[in-house]
A protein has these predicted regions:
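N-terminal glycine/threonine-rich, aromatic-flanked beta-hairpin/loop signature
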Residues: 4, 9, 20-61
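Short, surface-exposed beta-strand/loop "edge" segments at domain boundaries and coil↔beta transitions
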Residues: 20, 48-54, 73-79, 100-106
């Protein structure tokens, strides 16, 4: 797996722990990867969980995958955790962990990003995921 194979927007279609209603509660659930300078970064949101990813490509027993740590919001509380994913027959499959909380397998499919999304990293400490989304929607395009 290369960085290029991951770059882009992936729509979360299924999670082991949460149903489609929760996944798409605030925005359509997604995970997105991009290069910042020479580093693979990303972001995700499902339900009221939103996070920014610091990613690394790894290889174990001949299988390539991406792993990450994340920080962000879990409902209106600070959140953090880790996760991993691999490509499987055109899908992104993996597992997301919330530190000292739930973890869930997920599946995602590549899609075009719906509408404009401000991809600049910003602190949202003390702001709920829905408030953060409204704030991003009001940000003028860069």
């Amino acid at each position: 797996m290369t960085n290029a194979a991951l770059i882009g927007y992936w729509k979360i279609t299924k999670m082991e722990v949460w149903d489609a209603g929760y996944i798409d509660l605030v925005v359509p659930g997604f995970i997105e990867f991009e290069m910042e300078d020479d580093h693979l970064m990303g972001q995700f949101q499902f339900g009221t969980v939103i996070g920014w990813l610091d990613c690394r490509i790894r290889n174990m027993s001949g299988q390539s995958y991406v792993e990450w740590s994340w920080e962000g919001q879990n409902d209106s509380d600070p959140g953090c955790g880790r996760g991993w994913a691999r490509l499987d027959d055109g899908k992104l499959v993996g597992r997301l962990f919330i530190h000292c909380g739930d973890d869930s397998a997920f599946e995602a499919v590549r899609q075009n990003r719906p509408g404009h999304r401000d991809r600049r990293r910003r602190s949202i400490k003390g702001v709920s995921a829905s408030q953060a989304q409204v704030s991003r929607e009001r940000t003028p395009p860069v």
